[in-house]
UniProtKB/Swiss-Prot annotation:
The active site is at C170 (acyl-thioester intermediate). Keywords: Acyltransferase, Cytoplasm, Transferase. It catalyses: octanoyl-[ACP] + L-lysyl-[protein] = N(6)-octanoyl-L-lysyl-[protein] + holo-[ACP] + H(+). One of its GO terms (cellular component) is cytoplasm. Substrate binds at R72, G73, G74, Q75, V76, T77, Y78, H79, S139, L140, G141, G152, V153, A154. The record marks K136 as: Lowers pKa of active site Cys. The gene is lipB. It is found in: Cytoplasm. This is Octanoyltransferase. One of its GO terms (biological process) is protein modification process.
Length: 216
């Protein structure tokens, strides 16, 4: 068996967006050439996040949901309970991959995850993320600093999709969102959030060529 580099996996449970964002920045700023890569898994309370390309007009009616201007790529999106948010904190130089290749690998990992639930999905060349019959199930936004990535991907498991109607998701007016629980016959294959997270961790680490190891 080949000794693959370690990917430390941290399950953060339910955690507010801003402290996790700050922790990602601190981790990235503090890491060196020997720091193992990490994957953080989290569910955020309801929040809209604006990417660096975000435009105010895409926030149609945020209402009581807070809006956070963040430093990731992309436009506005929604995070909420029932959405698996995965933050791969990776040394891209060490992995010898570029940003575009990382985006592709993350999209491939979501496609492979959905295939385990017998769902056909695909990325779009002009709109990062993963789609099922034109409806978006996973949103993606990254930042790279010092050759290291942070931010990541949000996969709709059983999240309430209604808040997406309060924005133009990722800057696209009328973009329909979907979620895993609505695409699976749950009488035959139950959708359990913790199981989805475990499957995704296994798939992403394999695609990256890393060995997942749980970190408390």
């Amino acid at each position: 068996m080949t000794d693959l580099p370690i990917l430390h996996v941290k399950n953060l449970g339910k955690a507010d967006y801003q402290p996790v964002w700050q922790a990602m920045k601190d981790f990235t700023d503090g890491r060196d050439a020997h720091t193992p890569d990490e994957l953080w898994l989290v569910e955020h309370p309801p929040v809209f996040t604006q990417g660096q390309a975000g435009k105010a007009e895409h926030l149609l009616a945020p209402g009581a949901i807070p809006v956070v201007a963040t430093d990731r790529g992309g436009q506005v999106t929604y995070h909420g309970p029932g959405q698996l948010v995965a933050y791969p904190l990776l040394d891209l130089r060490r992995l010898k991959i570029g940003v575009r290749e990382l985006v592709t690998k993350i999209e491939q990992s979501v496609v492979a995850l959905l295939a385990e639930y017998k769902i056909d999905s695909a990325p779009k060349a002009d709109a990062p993320g993963v789609y099922v019959n034109g409806d978006k199930i996973a949103s993606l936004g990254l930042r790279v600093r010092k050759g290291c990535s942070f931010h990541g991907v949000a996969i709709n498991v059983d999240v309430d999709l209604a808040p997406f109607n309060q924005i133009n998701p990722c800057g696209y007016a009328g973009l329909n969102m979907t979620r895993l629980v609505d695409l699976v016959d749950t009488t035959k294959q139950p959708v359990v959030f913790s199981d989805v997270a475990k499957r995704y961790t296994r798939i992403l680490s394999n695609i990256l060529g890393l060995t997942a190891q749980l970190k408390e």
